[in-house]
Amino acid sequence: MRIPVYKSVYLYLTHACNANCSFCYRRGLFERNKVSSLGPVKMSKQTADDILDFCFSKLQLAPKFTIYFWGGEPTVNFEVIRHVMERFPQMIFHMNTNGALIDERMYEFFSRHRNIGITWSFGNCYEKYGGPQGKAEAEPWMLKLVRENPNHNVNFMVVEYGKLKEDFDFIARNITRNITIDLATRHDHSREDLERFAAQYFELLIEHEKDAELFQTLNPALHSNAYVREFGLKAQVREFHFCRTGLERLFIDTEGGIWQCDNMYICRHNRLGSVYDGIDYSKLDYVWEIDENREKYLGRFCESCELYKRCPRNKCLGLNLEHMGNMFDPEPGYCAMNKVLAKVIDKYIQLEKEKREGVHV
């Protein structure tokens, strides 16, 4: 039985959320289970203390161990966030938030504590506010927080495909240059929409190519196996990505139950234990086996795919299990997103090759 070294723990602070976004992953949890069966709506301060006491006394932790505040909307349970951060001021924290509940009191607290990185999710900007500008104007304290601290970032979940370039430029000019672009995994993207996304994404790459800081954040090729295979150290390439669920991070629910990750929690699959009873590490044996034999497991169902052995994003075992009933059978919508992202990467790699060949002529 092997014991992992953990890089992070996710504290699932609450089931509650103020936004009710159409693409939210929590929908899968509540469609499968009665809320009353999922433990307290909010994590208590005592449970949070018990969780972190367990982590620091029982787990093997990496040097830069990070505590993530998760939900639901984490700021619904701000009192526990404040309690944990004040009790462990030496730790590194991160939080994802839709930003709507950030008020002056929270702004002042997070401004004083520079050991937390905050991701402001813009996924609901069209659904709730008509676009990025409307969201920024509606959430002034969150806007101020992100503008003042370059460690905070915006995660822009694209649903208006033809406006990607316009919206990205608005965020970069008016909010922050620390931006990640993503596509919702629980949204039905049409082929035409994904093609429009790919075209605008490539335009952004070319527009910001000489802006080293922004380009590093924006460019998917720099973080893909395909790019490393062409221009980097081939020894760094792993042909089948997956998140090593349960081997690097843990997800802990509102009553102290320990799960491999948030998607496995949604599926109620393979609960590892609790902070009160400990972890049964033998339940992770199959993940070690997958990690050591990636092609055997992660390549299953994929042999005929054009992206076989070069898929640009992680295979999400929990997402597959939730939607397909088999953790190795890729969810079709996720495959479609990977294919359009690969198209952008391949196009950029070809451009890079042509430039490098031109230099050597």
Predicted regions and their residues:
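C-terminal accessory region of radical SAM enzymes
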Residues: 199-232, 262-312
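Radical SAM/AdoMet-radical enzyme domain recognition
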Residues: 48-70, 77-193
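Short, small/polar residue-rich loop motifs at catalytic or cofactor-binding pockets
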Residues: 242-247
